[in-house]
Amino acid sequence: MTVEDFEELAAGAPEHVSLEFLFGQVGAKVMPDGDHSEMIKWLQRQCMQHRPDLWLYPEAGLVVEAYRKGRARPDGVLAPDGAFAGQGEWAEAAGVLMTVEVTSFDADTDGRDRREKPRAYAEAGIPVYLLIDRSTAEAVIHSEPVKGEYSVELRLPLGKVVTLPEPVGFDLETGALLSLIR
């Protein structure tokens, strides 16, 4: 399938279906549960407090992977306010400082959130990828993309202070997320 074919398919998908195209494969994102939504809301608030010059855009469509062949809808995209003005459904990743994913409880989570997305985001040159892994109750911080891979991966249990590296550059007190792990 070509990127153009995928974009046509995604444009015709029902409103409640969110499709992604990573490494030549079409995938459907699971609709978030309440705890997932609360985690994203909490993270939006943290980003606003620490970096009011930035905004955590939920579910923004991004052009990812090497050669701009992939399309992803991260749970959150941290970028300067107004970064996506004038862009279409699938925006260029230039200017994006961080992508965020919160794991879902589906069969695709391991391959998608833990393997494919770090590679796709690193290939796009996104400086930081934050994975809130509900299965392991960890925050996984990927940073310093080099040749399509993140050269640094740090795993911290939720409840600890998580330092997001530059260019994001602030600490997250993740204790509040523990009540959303079930």
Each model region followed by its residue ranges:
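Gly/Pro/Ser/Thr-rich low-complexity, intrinsically disordered segments predominantly at protein N-termini
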Residues: 1-182
